[in-house]
Design a protein with these regions (language model features):
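Short Asp/Glu-rich motifs
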Residues: 19, 53-56, 137
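Glycine- and acidic-residue-enriched helix-capping/strand-helix junction motifs
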Residues: 16-28
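Nucleotide-activated donor-dependent transferases that construct or modify glycoconjugates
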Residues: 5-19, 96
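Residues that mark the start of a beta-strand
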Residues: 4-7, 41, 117
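Glycine-rich beta-alpha loop elements in corrinoid/cobalamin-binding modules
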Residues: 34, 44-51, 74-139
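Charged, often glycine-rich, active-site loop that binds/positions anionic groups
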Residues: 51-80
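A short, Lys/Arg-enriched amphipathic alpha-helix followed by its capping loop at the start of a domain
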Residues: 31-40
């Protein structure tokens, strides 16, 4: 049995970018490398908006942000990956969820955190990155 808590790093969607895979947020990768060097496996979930939702949001900017509009690229510590529509069950296997959040991602990070707390109150969620650093009271 693994004595380490299961950790999931999360990159919330960048709904305001044309291509959400233009750049990588390096913080989670650095932390994953550090943990791996110390024998602690972790997975990475990259949430991104479906093309259909992007088209609808462009046509109607007032359309609310919905988690159901997301896909999830899950990269596991064993090297396997999956790319599927958002399913809240993704969080079931984890005890710690760590989000790296920049200000344009904050609304989605709050939605994700709310969903995690509603469905899985046992999970510890951590929000880091530039947004919480500068907007601590808001977070």
């Amino acid at each position: 049995m693994n004595s380490h808590k299961q950790i999931l790093f999360v990159k919330p969607p960048d709904r305001f970018l044309e291509n959400e895979f233009v750049y990588q947020q390096l913080g989670p990768h650095y932390l994953q490398s550090f943990l791996a060097e110390h024998g602690v496996p972790s997975d990475l979930a990259i949430f991104y908006q479906t093309e259909e939702a992007r088209t609808e949001r462009c046509a109607n900017p007032e359309r609310p942000l919905l988690l159901e509009d997301l896909k999830t690229l899950l990269i596991r510590s064993d090297g396997t990956s999956s790319d599927e529509l958002f399913d809240e069950k993704i969080f079931l296997d984890y005890e710690v969820i760590a989000m790296s959040v920049m200000t344009p991602q904050a609304s989605d990070a709050y939605l994700l955190n709310k969903k995690i707390k509603e469905l899985h109150p046992r999970i510890t969620s951590v929000i880091g990155g530039s947004h919480p650093r500068y907007y601590q009271k808001q977070v």
